[in-house]
Amino acid sequence: MTNSPRTAAIIVAAGRGLRAGAGGPKQYRSLAGRPVIARAMEPFCTHPGVMAVQPVTNPDDTEMFNAAVAGLNFRPAVGGGATRQASVRAGLEALAELKPDIVLIHDAARCFVTPELISRAITAAGATGAALPVVPVTDTIKQVDSSGAVDATPDRASLRIAQTPQAFRFDVILDAHRRAASGGRDDFTDDAAIAEWAGLTVSTFEGDANNMKMTTPEDFAREESRLMAALGDIRTGTGYDVHAFGEGDHVWLCGLKVPHTRGFLAHSDGDVGLHALVDAILGALADGDIGSHFPPTDPQWKGAASDKFLKYAIDRVTARGGRVANLEVTMICERPKIGPLRDAMRQRIAEITGVPVSRVAVKATTSEKLGFTGREEGIAATASATIRLPWGADGLAG
C-alpha cells in the first residue's frame, strides 16, 4: 500500500485588498456572519490529508487574524512580504522544518474552497509534481492595445481561468521561489508562473466555478445575498400553556396517555405540551395562536386530540415552503414524573411532526413546591420552535 503524501497548506493572507473598497482587508470582512479568512482556512484545517496549515499574514493584522480564526487548528502565522510572491516564500521557509512532500498554496480571498477540491489538488501534485485547478473560459476574450482597440480574439478553447489551491512538490517549489528571489524576479502573480519560469511542467486539474476570489464590493454583495438565501429565513417562536387538574385517571402529555390520579379540565384533551408547541410554531410564523385557530367556544374541538392541532401547525409551515429545524418543550409539574417518559414523548412528537427525533427535546422541571404547580393543582409547559422559511415566503426580499 502506498503511503499518502505528507501535505501542508499555505494560506496567503497578507494583502490589503484595496479593490474590495472600504472596510479593512477583505480577508477579515464578514460574509454571511463569518470572516472570509475563516471560511477559507477551515477546509484545510479539517481535511484529513493536510497535516499542517501555515497562515501568512500582515503583522499589523495580528489582532484581527486571531479573532477571525479562533478555534481553528494551524501553525503560528508568519509575516508576509511586500508582494504575494514574497509572502508565499515566507510561508514555504516556515514549513521547511516539517519537510512536507506536497504543499498547497491558497489565497485567503478564495473562501469557497471545498474538501473535494483540496483532495484533487493533493492527488494532482502527487502525480505530476506541479498542478493548478482551472475552469473553462466561457466568455469571448479580447486582446486590446494600449489605446483600448481590439488587437486579437484568442481562441478560448485553449484558455483556462487559474484558481488556487495550487499544488506542488514542496522541494521543487521552494527551490523555484529561492531562485526567483536570488535572481531579482518578484513580479510573478501566482506560483504556477514561478514553476513555469523554473522549467517545471505544470499540469491542470478540474477546478470549481464556485471557488471564486472575493475582490470587489460587488463580489461581497452578490455572495452575501447567495449565502443568506441558502441559509434561509430563520424564525423562532415560544409557547406556553397550562391546565388545571379535574376528574379523571389519566392526562395527555406530549402525545402520550399517561396514567395519573386526576385528569385535566380542558375543552380538548388538554395536552399542555403539544399546545405549547403549537403556539411556538404559530408564533414563529407570526400566525396567531392556538386559540385563534381552534377556539375553545367551537364544539367541534370538544375532546379533540391535540396531535391534530400540532399537525395543523406543521402544515402551516410546509405550506409556506418551510421546515421545522428544532422543537423543545419543558414540562413544569411535581407529578407525574416526566423523566421515565422523556424518550417516548420525544418519539411521539417526532412521529406527529415528521421532525427527526434528534431535533426534538423534552425537558422537565418543578416550581420547588411554589405556586399552582407546586401545590399539584395543574401542569404548565413552555416550548420553543425554530423554523426555516425560504426568503420571500412573506414577501420579503432575500
From Swiss-Prot:
Bifunctional enzyme that catalyzes the formation of 4-diphosphocytidyl-2-C-methyl-D-erythritol from CTP and 2-C-methyl-D-erythritol 4-phosphate (MEP) (IspD), and catalyzes the conversion of 4-diphosphocytidyl-2-C-methyl-D-erythritol 2-phosphate (CDP-ME2P) to 2-C-methyl-D-erythritol 2,4-cyclodiphosphate (ME-CPP) with a corresponding release of cytidine 5-monophosphate (CMP) (IspF). A divalent metal cation binds at D241, H243, H275. One of its GO terms (molecular function) is metal ion binding. It comes from Rhodopseudomonas palustris (strain ATCC BAA-98 / CGA009). Gene3D superfamilies: 2-C-methyl-D-erythritol 2,4-cyclodiphosphate synthase, Spore Coat Polysaccharide Biosynthesis Protein SpsA, Chain A. The lineage of its organism: Bacteria, Pseudomonadati, Pseudomonadota, Alphaproteobacteria, Hyphomicrobiales. This is Bifunctional enzyme IspD/IspF. The record marks R156, K213 as: Positions MEP for the nucleophilic attack. The record marks R19, K26, H267, T366 as: Transition state stabilizer. Keywords: Isoprene biosynthesis, Lyase, Metal-binding, Multifunctional enzyme, Nucleotidyltransferase, Transferase. Signal peptide: none annotated. Residues 235-398 are annotated as: 2-C-methyl-D-erythritol 2,4-cyclodiphosphate synthase. Its cofactor is a divalent metal cation. It catalyses: 2-C-methyl-D-erythritol 4-phosphate + CTP + H(+) = 4-CDP-2-C-methyl-D-erythritol + diphosphate; 4-CDP-2-C-methyl-D-erythritol 2-phosphate = 2-C-methyl-D-erythritol 2,4-cyclic diphosphate + CMP. InterPro entries: IspD (IPR001228), IspD/F (IPR026596), IspD/TarI (IPR034683), ISPD_synthase_CS (IPR018294), MECDP_synthase (IPR003526), MECDP_synthase_CS (IPR020555), MECDP_synthase_sf (IPR036571), Nucleotide-diphossugar_trans (IPR029044). The gene is ispDF. 4-CDP-2-C-methyl-D-erythritol 2-phosphate binds at D241, V242, H243, H267, S268, D289, I290, G291, T365, T366, S367, E368, F372, R375.
